[in-house]
Amino acid sequence: MEKQRYYISTAIAYTSGKPHIGNTYEVVLADAIARFKRQQGYDVYFQTGTDEHGQKIELKAEEAGVTPKEFVDNVSGEIKRIWDLMNTSYDKFIRTTDKDHEEQVKKIFKKMYAKGDIYKGHYEGMYCTPCESFFTESQLVDGKCPDCGRPCVPAKEEAYFFKMSKYADKLIDYINTHPDFIQPESRKNEMMNNFLLPGLQDLCVSRTSFKWGIPVDFDPKHIVYVWLDALTNYITGIGYDCDGNSSEKFNKYWPADLHLIGKDIIRFHTIYWPIFLMSLDLPLPKQVFGHPWLLQGDGKMSKSKGNVIYADELVEFFGVDAVRYFVLHEMPFENDGVITWDLMVERLNSDLANTLGNLVNRTISMSNKYFNGIVENKNVTEPVDEDLKNFILQVPKNVSAKMDKLRVADAITEVFSLFKRCNKYIDETMPWALAKDETKQDRLATVLYNLVEGICIGASLLKSFMPRTTERILVQLNANERTLEDMEQFGLYPSGNRVTDKPEILFARLDLKEVLEKVEKLHPKKEEKKEEVKEEKEEAKDVIDIEAKPEITFDDFEKLQFQVGEIIACEEVKKSRKLLCSQVKIGSQVRQIVSGIKAHYSAEEMVGKKVMVVTNLKPAKLAGILSEGMILCAEDADGNLSLMVPEKEMPAGAEIC
């Protein structure tokens, strides 16, 4: 019987620099999904790679004193090294500088032009270099890029345009009739309400102001727009050919089952990409999932903030599987997750060293101590055994259900619930007490057999998330990996088998203080400059009115108005270490709000967030800038701030009561 096919891809990583753990999360997430699909019996094709063209790369290479190709060769190699370090099982690592990709992009552009979907004109408007995106004046938010909040520069040049509006109605109909196409649901609502329903403008798809890119075949002074180049990797990487000579691999795997991407590029993948495919008369991918961000403790990671955590640094401290476990376990389905060194140590010690590692070590040690390593099922059972078996046999079903919905963090929680149940079983049966009673030896053997069997099932389920740990556990138990079908039965471990007589520690406990001291040496904190202290004092003059407030009555409290606001633009307040100035959409209004959160959030990461706002405060000036409200945050004992955000998707302007 032929296997069902499953094609999964990540967004290709932009080669502007070394990827941090937030970037790395996406490929680890895709790898976990791909591995589990293989466990389910699918014929899986997993593609990732690097996006290597564009003006930003050209500028970076110039700064580095190398050619663009030399620059991307180096960065792409580093990205691939980290993907391999994280033990990702991709089938294809595509580069947009691959010759076969470049040739197909030229053909695709030419085909769209011949079809009348691309036409030549003149572009005059605004361009965001970091986003490689064009905007009209009306699309800018407070004069800044609506996507990243950074300044745009005027651009005036001859260009080719794609007729986006030609396919807009067709795309809207497709989204409405394919409810799973854009996930999570909140991303779909954002695309429909903010972009498609208001109407699409034609998209500029070529540039003449830089040279690092794929030239338009019939007009080589034009360079193909980087997103048209990058998005087509999903089909060129599996052998698509414009001339009708597509490979067997393309015919086998397209359309893709899942494009896994960051939530910040959902528009390109759910509007531009589907329309490009419609132009090529190709079927659309079955699902685009915009995953949340993995944030450092004080906000989105960025080199400018100095809060970047790199995957290879984490691996050096914790090991590959511990890092994989953390990023997969700590990321909710829809909301952003947080990573800190403290949390990493806490998770390793509690979940990996204690719950999992201690369970495996205790079970093997008791098997050696009481039965010379022989694990034999004597079938001397009690009701507690049936409870254990029923619990364990339900876990694979729960994991499959969670993974089918891409709820990876929930799936890992299910696996660890199995290990926790086994630990509880040890407390319930007390093997050490049974060992003291000569008449209970067969009962003791049965208990240890049940533990080994349960661990084998749990370890096999763990393979998609922590593959090397699975292998290490099964080797020590002298056991084979179970298939999901095998996991429908309890008792497949060969009775009379012998476990290792030298159990290894899976995860050694770490001392938080020692880890933080090493991190400090790795990333020493910069001393505060005198002028920064002086500046803080100057800022204090503007906010001196903020003091501890007296008790108020309920009537006083009811005077306050709280609403949900959506930050549509944000910029740093010049000459200020603390302040950000945000443009906040509240219902049909846009308010300007100044907040002292610059040390905790960058201006870029604020854009797009839904926050809680006090909307009826009397306007006041902070650092000379008018502020028309207050964005609410929580503060811990160490002075760390966290934005107060709605738990569920709520519209801007919703009242908080």
Model-predicted regions and their roles:
Residues 1-48, 100-104, 154-369, 411-415:
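Structured secondary-structure scaffolds
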Residues 2-75, 94-109, 114, 131, ...:
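N-terminal catalytic cores of NTP/NDP-binding nucleotidyl/phosphoryl-transfer enzymes
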Residues 76-91:
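A glycine-rich helix N-cap at a beta->alpha junction
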Residues 115-168, 172:
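Cys/His-rich short segments
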Residues 120, 343-380, 391-499, 614:
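Helix-rich, typically C-terminal accessory recognition domains appended to large enzymatic cores
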Residues 287-290, 474-476, 581:
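Beta-strand segments within the central parallel beta-sheet cores of soluble alpha/beta enzyme folds
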Residues 470-556:
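Intrinsic disorder at enzyme termini
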Residues 535-657:
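Phosphate-backbone binding interfaces of nucleic-acid-interacting proteins
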